[in-house]
């Protein structure tokens, strides 16, 4: 009897130990926001429609959960069902991989305004760097949904309930995400997870639709799908004020520190603050470095390593003047030399034209402010190399 009890105890301890070696870690995430204009919402109501959205994960896993958000809406959103599947071309899916997700055992849930919910944990063979399809069947929805405007990926909307084995008869297509906020996997406790704070250059303005080639995507691929890289960039966003959606100074806790499993943070934001300068720029320099210090302090308090990304060149764009350039140089010098950061990812140095360091390389620019796909590829590879060097220190 004593031997049986001892064996049972050892089994229980082994299971507890196994659980302690794992943690929920975000493999994909996005920064939720309110619609900025009418074009940020579908022409067709989401109510009583099925929405198929595609995401590109970084690390894989055998158990996952999805976070859905209604944080930016003023009315409840009714979710009748959600299923995931390996994504194919366009709206196609591999029907053999379809897995319905539940909420406390139920397929349906109503998310109150200002709230977010998790699905129950589900078994799923999620491969590193794969594309995953998320299909939501809605009941009643708010007229203005919680969104992420810059998905850089096509989403598909069809009338009524989508059946996994039936063709998805899309009535509308658009490049926005709605209600999906994060996908997490159960990963070893040693897993690194990099949360990237940024604006449209992180959000991927200038990338190729449906190619998942933001610099963060390239970074994840260069790291071989072994390190989680999550993109919390918002197009037009500022650190202090004046941009689109809540500034980084207000959203840092929610969008960065609340992500599960984060071990490292890259702060790569400030160009929109600089672009909006209408004086000598001294105050903007002070405010940017003030919040960089605050962000770094918050990360350090949670045991998170934090790196600063220098602001990339913008000569030949509407942001450029001698004053704006001087502020960029001042802020970048602070980023390169600050003791608040555990390291600097010198995107400025990586992307500037050797013949004119105030401008992007011509072959890497989309509009002289944003890189093109080749520029983002160079940035992602550069960031991955820098990250690996930081791990040696």
Language-model segments: residues:
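Catalytic His-Asp segment of secreted/periplasmic serine-dependent ester chemistry enzymes
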Residues: 275, 312-393
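Hydrophobic membrane-targeting alpha-helices
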Residues: 13-17
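Conserved SGNH/GDSL esterase-like catalytic core that processes O-acyl groups on lipids
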Residues: 28, 47-53, 76, 80-85, ...
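Surface-exposed amphipathic alpha-helices with a cationic face
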Residues: 292-300
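N-terminal secretory targeting modules
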Residues: 2, 9, 19-197, 207-209, ...
